[in-house]
Amino acid sequence: LALEALGPTFVKLGQALSTRSDLFPDEYIDEFAKLQDNVPAFDSALAVQIIEKSLKKPLLEVFKSFDEVPMAAASIAQVHSAVLKNGDEVVVKVVRPNIQKVILRDIQLMEMIAHAVENYVSGGERLRPVEVVQEYRRTILSELDLTREAANGMQLKRNFEGSTEMYIPHIYMEYVCKDIMVMEK
């Protein structure tokens, strides 16, 4: 898809649009659903800097070991495997450096395109493109704050406490900041 060539913000938009069968025909939904975050990892030295800055302490004061090669990388963050000082195996999610600037710039472009579609394309207003982009803006910007994601995860864990059907990993709230989240592996 052309959205992949435009970068991670547009890929995330396409992924979000894949759930909007009320707005697009099935053939579009099927194509949007194929979008993946094919994003290379960012430099592990930057990940370490972000972790140390967020936690306000050296990496090895928190972790017994930290795998500098990420387990996974996506458009918003990447994930590293680590072991806490107490021996617990964890994953460390780290938000990409400068991703908020990139996303805000891309959203400005999306808003301009949405206004053009709404105002100049026949039937464009039916798709409500400005509304879709505004909703997307709220959603993607909230994804950048890992404290919110951690709080949602903790609520989910409480909701399913005692369940044999679903297991929600423990989140180490003492190691959660806007840009990092540490959770059970």
Regions found by a protein language model. Give the residues of each.
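Broad phosphate/nucleotide-binding scaffolds in NTP-utilizing and phosphate-metabolizing enzymes
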Residues: 1-185
